Amino acid sequence: MEGPTHPKPSKDKTFSWDLMILVGVLLRLDVGMANPSPHQIYNVTWTITNLVTGTKANATSMLGTLTDAFPTMYFDLCDIIGNTWNPSDQEPFPGYGCDQPMRRWQQRNTPFYVCPGHANRKQCGGPQDGFCAVWGCETTGETYWRPTSSWDYITVKKGVTQGIYQCSGGGWCGPCYDKAVHSSITGASEGGRCNPLILQFTQKGRQTSWDGPKSWGLRLYRSGYDPIALFSVSRQVMTITLPQAMGPNLVLPDQKPPSRQSQIESRVTPHHSQGNGGTPGITLVNASIAPLSTPVTPASPKRIGTGNRLINLVQGTYLALNVTNPNKTKDCWLCLVSRPPYYEGIAVLGNYSNQTNPPPSCLSDPQHKLTISEVSGQGSCIGTVPKTHQALCKKTQKGHKGTHYLAAPSGTYWACNTGLTPCISMAVLNWTSDFCVLIELWPRVTYHQPEYVYTHFDKTVRLRREPISLTVALMLGGLTVGGIAAGVGTGTKALLETAQFGQLQMAMHTDIQALEESISALEKSLTSLSEVVLQNRRGLDILFLQEGGLCAALKEECCFYADHTGLVRDNMAKLRERLKQRQQLFDSQQGWFEGWFNKSPWFTTLISSIMGPLLILLLILLFGPCILNRLVQFVKDRISVVQALILTQQYQQIKQYDPDQP
């Protein structure tokens, strides 16, 4: 750009050469980055640094990709100036600076311009010139000629601070006063910051590489010498802490996804015709798998099918998401992941209860060793947490003395290295090296924008963008400890949120119950197989009786089958009993008002339909007589006035005179 013709000589723009070394060092600081996927989410931190003092003027962190994590940054002009603009012997009253409220106020009304140092233009000079040795180097700022640029990375403009800026007369400068020093001044701000600036990234800045810090120079536009301030903008990219496994099974985190069988397509019978396409990693919940073994006898109770259980999980997730964030559910796809893990835990902060006796939740929920292979976030931890899992802890408590129980809030669990449990015993925790993290348990459901599925059916040849998979657990994390699951709050919204979350909890409970039945069926199959093997073994021993039995005939060591299914059967019986107790506890926690809506599905529709007319009728009955009386009284008053006017028109006023006057 070509700058205007200014009557200011370029020789006035001088600065200390010592800053060139500092800027040269900062420009060579590189952040080592690999070549990751462009859709990977990072924790991005942007920092504005005063190059003279090395202090940070602003540090903003956000989650996003390397192409969209560009926030708007706010800072004060004095944060990048420090004490470099304080008056000197040559200019005792400069009209700018940050050491006094009056100078800060005068500085606020002075224009400024910014010149980039990353352009490496020789005519613009170096740090001693603020990269503005000649006119035309400025790319942004707040002056009357409004400098702009199509290639620079940032724009810097003045911000707005509310307050009183009348510094004449009584000397009230409002926010230019530091409230820590002048607490009695009306409108005093933190540190006397009354020169706010707004930094935004341009389109060119969003496309450039931020491998190292980039510097700029800011100068005031005034008569005489233009003071210089140097600052840099840098980006720090950190990977988000990966989820870690919690539980005794250390094999789950390293397990591979299940292999795809070629015959599986012939065993899928679609219930509804919804297209022939499919997406890897997504479970088709509208399909049923043909049984591979003997079907269940008619005498056995009818259980909900696999397809219905999966649909209930997705439907419960949708209802919970629709209540908490309805804008996200206007047009989206919720996909149930078909590969393990099927559930994930989100570490949360919560107020767990400390009880001397075991609460009902400790008795009704299953206490088997269930491993959660993915736990992410940061929450409350208790016990001696190893260094490998300290990233999951935002608040750590070593333990409690005594023999009492810590019950997790409703809808949450303790994920311990010995398994998942709703409550923990401090006696066991103090005796062992166990540690636990408070988590929320969510089904593994991913959230996608509508374009995600459309791209799979698009037959045109184009490069498809890799979608950003966002699990619903990250979107609903903190829902239970926020009070919805516990029913905290009053009104229709609180009851609705509690009901929707309860439906999701019931769907997960049904899925876990189906898992128990699958394990029981596997145990029965194993027992039946062992009986067949033992029967064949006895038959072969009879055939080789003369040789001394089968083992002697084979000249091998004799092997005997040890059946451990009895222990499995006992554990499954206990699990069924606890599931039954949990169902009873779940039913007992529902209030009488919630029971109305659960007993009859049409009751909710009936209430919502007749509630409006009933309220209108009630208002008419309450306020109708009063309004009618007021209306009748008003009509009577108007009629009385009209009657009085008619009567006065029939008579004439008699003239009065004084008889004493002639």
From Swiss-Prot:
Lipid attachment locations (S-palmitoyl cysteine): 626
PTM: Specific enzymatic cleavages in vivo yield mature proteins. Envelope glycoproteins are synthesized as an inactive precursor that is N-glycosylated and processed likely by host cell furin or by a furin-like protease in the Golgi to yield the mature SU and TM proteins. The cleavage site between SU and TM requires the minimal sequence [KR]-X-[KR]-R. The R-peptide is released from the C-terminus of the cytoplasmic tail of the TM protein upon particle formation as a result of proteolytic cleavage by the viral protease. Cleavage of this peptide is required for TM to become fusogenic. The CXXC motif is highly conserved across a broad range of retroviral envelope proteins. It is thought to participate in the formation of a labile disulfide bond possibly with the CX6CC motif present in the transmembrane protein. Isomerization of the intersubunit disulfide bond to an SU intrachain disulfide bond is thought to occur upon receptor recognition in order to allow membrane fusion.
Cellular component terms (Gene Ontology): host cell plasma membrane; membrane; viral envelope; virion membrane
UniProt keywords, alphabetically: Cleavage on pair of basic residues, Coiled coil, Disulfide bond, Fusion of virus membrane with host cell membrane, Fusion of virus membrane with host membrane, Glycoprotein, Host cell membrane, Host membrane, Host-virus interaction, Lipoprotein, Membrane, Palmitate, Signal, Transmembrane, Transmembrane helix, Viral attachment to host cell, Viral envelope protein, Viral penetration into host cytoplasm, Virion, Virus entry into host cell
Chain ranges passing through the membrane: 607-627
Positions glycosylated per UniProt: 43, 58, 286, 322, 327, 351, 354, 430
Membrane-side (Cytoplasmic) residue stretches: 628-662
ATP-binding among keywords: no
InterPro entries registered for this protein in UniProt: FMuLV_rcpt-bd, TLV/ENV_coat_polyprotein
Domain of life: Viruses
Keyword presence, Disulfide bond: yes
Site residues by UniProt (Cleavage): 465-466, 645-646
Extracellular side: 35-606
Bias (Polar residues): 258-274
Domains as described in the record: The 17 amino acids long immunosuppressive region is present in many retroviral envelope proteins. Synthetic peptides derived from this relatively conserved sequence inhibit immune function in vitro and in vivo.
Subunit structure: The mature envelope protein (Env) consists of a trimer of SU-TM heterodimers attached by a labile interchain disulfide bond.
Name of the protein in question: Envelope glycoprotein
Name of the encoding gene: env
